[in-house]
Amino acid sequence: MKTITTDWELIPYSEAWSRQTEWFDALVHAKQNGESYENRIIFCEHPHVYTLGRSGKENNMLLGEEQLKTIGATLYHIDRGGDITYHGPGQLVCYPILNLEEFGLGLKEYVHLLEEAVIRVCASYGVVAGRLEKATGVWLEGDTSRARKICAIGVRSSHYVTMHGLALNVNTDLRYFSYIHPCGFIDKGVTSLQQELGHSIDMAEVKERLGRELLAALLSK
């Protein structure tokens, strides 16, 4: 089956979640019934929003409802793995809706593939990134006291079909992370390509590079 890349650009989180769920359910149904389907890789950005995963703790959100309103943000409890994270303008969000069995992937291998694609994109900008033991996502200087996350990953899988995905900080306003314990960590920082390089990055270029890396990784399986 073919894999289609789609760009939703700036889209409210609730709308993106609804569309994702619709396509996810359709792929699961098609797979179970032997029907044709399309794998999708979706790119987008969101207005300021926080999402709390299934294993997340409420106290990792440091603001109350009224305080969230004052910073123009909302909070959603969602059905992915992981704890709390932030999405906002300048952050590249990627939602792959894929049949993992088609690519010979298990869930752990799939998360590793997402991490590797982001690591390669960072390297293409001269930013050395890697993994942190017992923590998903992509990190800089992960084995030091200066460890900081540049990409969060949280997925949902059912019948080896995926939704949700990754969030890469490109030109993100990092102040919004100060209102949470990102991914449940209280002793780790966050960063962005802009923060590391000292200048803004062309978002369209990052999308192109990440899309290329993801497709290459999937097709190599």
Swiss-Prot record:
CDD domains per record: LipB
Top-level taxon: Bacteria
GO BP of this protein: protein modification process
Primary residence: cytoplasm
Top-level EC class: transferase
Binding site for substrate: R80, G81, G82, D83, I84, T85, Y86, H87, A152, I153, G154, G165, L166, A167
Cell compartment(s), UniProt: Cytoplasm
Family listed: Belongs to the LipB family.
HAMAP family: LipB
Purpose of the protein: Catalyzes the transfer of endogenously produced octanoic acid from octanoyl-acyl-carrier-protein onto the lipoyl domains of lipoate-dependent enzymes. Lipoyl-ACP can also act as a substrate although octanoyl-ACP is likely to be the physiological substrate.
Protein name (record): Octanoyltransferase
Organism: Bacteroides fragilis (strain ATCC 25285 / DSM 2151 / CCUG 4856 / JCM 11019 / LMG 10263 / NCTC 9343 / Onslow / VPI 2553 / EN-2)
Gene: lipB
